[in-house]
Amino acid sequence: MTEMAAADFGQCAISNQPSMHLPYLYSAIGNIGKAARYVRRILREGYNENVFPGDEDNGSMSAWYIFGVLGFYPVCPGSGKYVLGVCNARNITVKLGSGNILNIINETDGSSAFRVSFNGANIKENFIAHDKLMRGGTLRFYTEV
């Protein structure tokens, strides 16, 4: 249980893998703003160039960090869907294994995303399909509705 106490974020024991999805459950039920606040706090307070919350656990803490910065997370691994959050960088370019490019653009004011689009089409759901991202394109987070 020492792993759960290593990072004090209340019931969200981010240093323990069974809790890594908890901030994104807010987004899954439609409250992206609350998810964004938790994720940003964890990124800011739990990570730096020398520290992970808890131990690295064969890449799981690094993977959580990367998803937190990208703005989406696999709440239900294997489902083929990522729950949307908020991108925590201004612009990201990901070169996919297929050679396709995924551009992620953050146009939010830093609080939350009220609108997300993929290749110019608004995303009405609170998730995006893995297959869609793997084809490449532009995922854009906006503050305005």
What is each stretch, according to the model?
Residues 1-101, 131-138:
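Active-site core of glycosidic bond-cleaving carbohydrate-active enzymes
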Residues 85-91, 106-114:
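A short, compositionally biased
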Residues 101, 108-145:
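C-terminal beta-sandwich/jelly-roll accessory domains of carbohydrate-active enzymes
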